[in-house]
């Protein structure tokens, strides 16, 4: 299990990462990583970065077969 400090350190080294990448790198369940990231966001230590749907060909995620899978959510330190 990873601590919040390890999550912070990995984000500092990598710049920005997805929660799934953090979970795999730290061998920690993703719900725990999600909770730590949300807590870090509430403390003002991390920020959520969402990609724009500019790469979407149709512009409509509802009709996209992948749903909103094309909209990635990244995390970075403030």
Swiss-Prot record:
<comment type="similarity">
    <text>Belongs to the FeoC family.</text>
</comment>
<feature type="binding site">
    <location>
        <position position="64"/>
    </location>
    <ligand>
        <name>iron-sulfur cluster</name>
    </ligand>
</feature>
<dbReference type="InterPro" id="IPR036388">
    <property type="entry name" value="WH-like_DNA-bd_sf"/>
</dbReference>
<protein>
    <recommendedName>
        <fullName>Probable [Fe-S]-dependent transcriptional repressor</fullName>
    </recommendedName>
</protein>
<dbReference type="GO" id="GO:0051536">
    <property type="term" value="F:iron-sulfur cluster binding"/>
</dbReference>
<keyword id="KW-0678">Repressor</keyword>
<keyword id="KW-0238">DNA-binding</keyword>
<dbReference type="InterPro" id="IPR036390">
    <property type="entry name" value="WH_DNA-bd_sf"/>
</dbReference>
<dbReference type="InterPro" id="IPR023732">
    <property type="entry name" value="FeoC"/>
</dbReference>
<dbReference type="GO" id="GO:0005506">
    <property type="term" value="F:iron ion binding"/>
</dbReference>
<feature type="binding site">
    <location>
        <position position="70"/>
    </location>
    <ligand>
        <name>iron-sulfur cluster</name>
    </ligand>
</feature>
<dbReference type="Pfam" id="PF09012">
    <property type="entry name" value="FeoC"/>
</dbReference>
<feature type="binding site">
    <location>
        <position position="56"/>
    </location>
    <ligand>
        <name>iron-sulfur cluster</name>
    </ligand>
</feature>
<comment type="function">
    <text>May function as a transcriptional regulator that controls feoABC expression.</text>
</comment>
<keyword id="KW-0408">Iron</keyword>
<keyword id="KW-0805">Transcription regulation</keyword>
<dbReference type="GO" id="GO:0003677">
    <property type="term" value="F:DNA binding"/>
</dbReference>
<keyword id="KW-0411">Iron-sulfur</keyword>
<dbReference type="InterPro" id="IPR015102">
    <property type="entry name" value="Tscrpt_reg_HTH_FeoC"/>
</dbReference>
<keyword id="KW-0804">Transcription</keyword>
<keyword id="KW-0479">Metal-binding</keyword>
<feature type="binding site">
    <location>
        <position position="61"/>
    </location>
    <ligand>
        <name>iron-sulfur cluster</name>
    </ligand>
</feature>
């Amino acid at each position: 299990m990873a601590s919040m400090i390890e999550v912070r350190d990995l984000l500092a080294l990598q710049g920005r990462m997805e929660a799934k990448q953090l979970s795999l790198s730290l061998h920690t369940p993703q719900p725990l990583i999600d909770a730590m990231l949300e807590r870090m966001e509430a403390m003002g230590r991390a920020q959520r970065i969402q990609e724009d749907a500019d790469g979407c060909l149709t512009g409509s995620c509802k009709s996209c077969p992948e749903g909103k899978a094309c909209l990635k959510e990244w995390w970075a330190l403030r």
